[in-house]
């Protein structure tokens, strides 16, 4: 049955992965979280990497949007606030480097 669906093009991991990444990026999730969820669903690492690479240009923009929406773009005033913001952004699936760049005001650096 599954083989028939695959042969007819009704089941396609590439299309599923594309749509999954697109949906999760729109929800404000980062590459780490998206990759982990796809791996849990049994998607091949190479396919995950290629789909995340296609969305790569927008990660910092997406991170800034999430940060502004949640924290109003306020730079942390103390260590405790910085840790709270960083924890939230890491939970959303962004890398430590990406989070650090946003919280240090260096989000535009490549």
State each model region's role.
Residues 1-110:
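An alpha-helical, amphipathic repeat domain used for nucleic-acid recognition
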